[in-house]
From Swiss-Prot:
Principal subcellular localisation of the protein: membrane
Upper lineage: Eukaryota, Fungi, Dikarya, Ascomycota, Saccharomycotina
Organism annotation: Saccharomyces cerevisiae (strain ATCC 204508 / S288c) (Baker's yeast)
Name the record gives this protein: Vacuolar protein sorting-associated protein 55
UniProtKB keywords: Endosome, Membrane, Phosphoprotein, Protein transport, Transmembrane, Transmembrane helix, Transport
Modification type Phosphoserine: residues: 137
Membrane topology: Multi-pass membrane protein
UniProt xrefs under Pfam families: Vps55
Transmembrane portions of the chain: 12-32, 38-58, 77-97, 108-128
Compartments it resides in: Endosome membrane
Domain of life: Eukaryota
């Protein structure tokens, strides 16, 4: 079976373009409508992966199984905080729209841009989860 391999440099370049698209959507949702409240959404989506990163730093090989008897309160708290921040990042533009602080197009652009920002951070962590010491070099 043929295995599809992508160099780490290609991954970084594609993810940076994906991240730039997310920032562009959020900034355009602010600049086109002369209202800069959606910039708070960038802050929330940038803070969202931090709890999982902090609590999973020393626990690289732990698999989360909800049926196991061992409990890891730190990881549960990290998952809760990350879920709360992602939900807040999605709901904040809706609240701004409901309060008539932003328009509906700005709300849609901000939500899509924020989700792109968060997903690019998660995909980056997923791509580079394995060690760089394997047979991949930086340029191929």
């Amino acid at each position: 079976m043929m295995e599809f391999k992508v160099s780490p440099l290609t991954k970084i370049i594609s993810l940076s373009g994906f991240l730039a698209l997310g920032f562009l959507l959020v900034i355009l949702s602010c600049a086109l409508f002369h209202n800069y409240y959606p910039l708070f959404d960038i802050l929330i989506f940038l803070l969202a992966p931090i709890p999982n990163t902090i609590f999973n730093a020393g626990n690289k090989y732990h698999t989360s199984d909800f049926m196991s008897d061992s409990s890891n309160t730190g990881q549960d708290l990290a998952h809760f905080l990350t879920g709360m921040l992602v939900t807040s990042g999605i709901a904040l533009p809706v609240v701004f729209y409901h309060c008539q602080l932003i328009g509906h197009l700005s709300c849609i652009m901000c939500m899509i841009g924020g989700l792109i920002i968060y997903s690019s951070i998660v995909i980056f962590k997923w791509f580079f989860k394995k060690d760089f010491n394997e047979d991949d070099s930086l340029f191929g």
